[in-house]
Amino acid sequence: MNSTETSTPTAPAAPKRADARRNYELILTAARKAFAEGGESTSLEEIARQAGVGIGTLYRHFPSRQVLLETLYVNEVHEVCRSASQRDDDPWKALSVWCQGLIGYLTTKRALAQELLKYLDEDAALFQECRRTVYAAGEPLLECAQEAGVVRPDVEFSDVLQMLAGISRMPANDPDQVEHVVRIALDGLRYRPQA
């Protein structure tokens, strides 16, 4: 049931009333946790129960499972991308810390993305907008590190994303191994003058 027309690249606006906003956030928090733990087997009724709200309240905020999934996905992408704006004075550290955060996001949100692909094609507007958001956040970090002479000049941001996407597919049951591979991969980006 793939459809690109129903997808919007931005999440529904959070409600303005304090109680409605609280319920909205409770639902998102419960859904984030439920999808991380149970994946596709998670029912909306279970999410409402975990959030401490009625199913009608959940549907008022999120009229379908797809809308809830899209909102979670967009919010998570924006959260990881916002961290890029909290730059460190050290361009290498700024890039590497952000890449490690993106790996953490990609690794833990794999199930969420797979669930969304039941509703959307890979080239849906939602995914395209999220890719643009990731590029807008990460590309300046790479360029800054290259200008500082700490990252190889032949590296494109698309190379970095491909590298991180590959690492994110590693089994997540050994975080130390994932961290080790991330360090090796990031070390491969470093500029080393020829002797």
What function would you assign to each model-found segment?
Residues M1-S41, E45-Q50, V67:
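Basic, helix-initiating cap at the start of DNA-binding domains
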Residues M1-A11, V97, G104, A136, ...:
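C-terminal peripheral helix-coil segments that are non-catalytic and often amphipathic
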Residues T71, R82-T108, E122, L126:
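Hydrophobic alpha-helical connector segments
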Residues S43, C81, A111-L117, V150, ...:
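Short, hydrophobic secondary-structure boundary micro-motifs
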Residues I103-P140, A165-N173:
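Short secondary-structure transition hinges
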Residues F62, L69-E76:
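Alpha-helical DNA-contacting segments of helix-turn-helix folds
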Residues E129-T133, E147-Q162, P171-D176:
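All-alpha amphipathic helical-bundle segments outside canonical DNA-binding/catalytic cores
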Residues G52-F62:
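Short hydrophobic/aromatic patch on the recognition helix
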